[in-house]
Amino acid sequence: MKLQFVTSGLRTTTQDLGRPGHTHMGVPTGGALDRSAMRYANHLVGNALAAPVLEVTLSGPHLHCLEAGRVALVGSGFDLLLNGEPQPPLLPISVNPGDELIIKSSGNGCRAYLSVSGQWHAERWLGSASALRIGSHELLPGAVWTRGDVLELSLIHI
């Protein structure tokens, strides 16, 4: 599955369970702020519970679907629109090439998690694909999404 960012929202990042066990070296655990929501979003699309997700903060992205797949949004205060139509919360949604996804804030929440079906093609550091900022520098380029970026995943074969 492939999704292209038309807009990225305020701060949309790649997050997983972070980097536990490295704080003695000065590396914060990081990862998704709401791990339960992250795991549930992954469960809805059939991914491993610890798989990366998109963490949306305050305002969500507008995504153009380049390939078919499934997505699920978990988090209060956000609505998922598919081609302009509101989708039911907490359910997997099938998308097709050409579809438009918009994650819209209702103003009542801070974060939401969009899981995307498949195996992520993401750079990892200390076992994690989570975005990590040190000062003003992003440690994993590509973990913070911007306009024009393409998220690419492979099908998971069981």
Regions found by a protein language model. Give the residues of each.
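Conserved "landmark" site that anchors the functional core of diverse proteins
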Residues: M1-I156
